[in-house]
Regions:
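Metal-dependent nucleotidyltransferase catalytic core
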Residues: 1-38, 43-92
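Polar/charged alpha-helical tracts
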Residues: 7-11, 15-16, 75, 105-112, ...
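A general structural signal for well-ordered secondary-structure junctions
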Residues: 20, 98, 152-153
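Conserved short hydrophobic patches within well-ordered secondary structure
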Residues: 22-24, 109-110, 114, 166
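Short, exposed beta-strand "edge-strand" segments with a Pro/Gly-rich flavor and a Y/T-containing core
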Residues: 50, 56-68, 95-101, 172-179, ...
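Conserved NTP/Mg2+-binding pocket subregion across the NTase superfamily
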Residues: 61-147
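Conserved nucleotidyltransferase catalytic core and NTase-mimicking acidic/glycine-rich helix/loop elements
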Residues: 118-225
């Protein structure tokens, strides 16, 4: 349920942009833990709009508005079907709340399509699996050399690529697309708790040697896939 601050800002936006066909609310403003330090995210959709962005500050609250038209949004959502990464448009629409619309059937069809797209299985090949494993091992070797040389900055980036490629491998082979980070932990708890434990071990480690040990466990786990 929207609090009074959000409601007041949404009323001001409706008055400022009375001719917008459809307005969707998504993101943190739909959550009960929204605070005044959070943003308000909106989608303006209309036949004459194009892909764009409007940034506002209203009553000291940051408002971020995406703009687009129905036809292009439909294309974006269809293109996200089966993707491991970047199902962003589908996520925004599938989790949104309709604040206003003069095109009820069109927007409801788009939201339904977005929800279906989020459920599509991940498209990947055996070559993709080989490349993920290769990248994990390659960046692990680089990370080992970084530790030997005491190159902390290089280790940071190489370790990141180990974790990124490993996570993509685990998600794809368990038929999950890469969600927003805040939703990733819950998915990993279900599909691969041991992998999640190694990720958390890496983050909690206080020195490079312990972090490297966690990376090696991550790589070993991936090579078993």
């Amino acid at each position: 349920m929207q609090n009074s601050i959000i409601k007041n800002i949404l009323n001001k936006i409706s008055q400022k942009y009375p001719k917008i066909d459809t307005i969707l609310l998504f993101g943190s403003a739909l959550s009960s833990d929204w605070t005044e330090e959070s943003d308000i995210d909106l989608y303006f959709i209309g036949k004459d709009l194009s892909d764009g962005r409007i940034d506002l500050i209203i009553d000291s609250i940051k408002v971020e508005i995406q703009t687009d038209n129905f036809n292009d949004l439909k294309t974006y959502i269809e293109d996200e079907s089966g993707k491991l990464l970047n199902r962003n448009v589908s996520t925004m629409l599938a989790t949104s709340e309709i604040l206003k619309t003069e095109s009820k059937e069109q927007i409801e069809n788009l939201i339904t399509l977005a929800k279906k797209t989020l459920k599509t299985p991940v498209d990947y090949t055996t070559e993709d699996v080989k490349m993920w494993k290769y990248s994990v091992n390659d960046y692990l070797e680089k990370s080992i050399k970084d530790v030997e040389r005491g190159n902390i900055a290089a280790f940071y980036f190489d370790a990141h690529f180990v974790i990124q490629n490993a996570t993509e491998l685990i998600l794809a082979t368990n038929n999950h697309y890469f969600p927003q980070p805040k939703n990733l932990t819950h998915i990993l708890e279900i599909i691969s708790p041991e992998f999640l434990k190694n990720i958390e071990g890496y983050e909690l480690a206080t020195n490079l040697n312990d972090k490297l040990l966690s990376l090696q466990k991550i790589a070993k786990f991936c090579n078993l896939k």
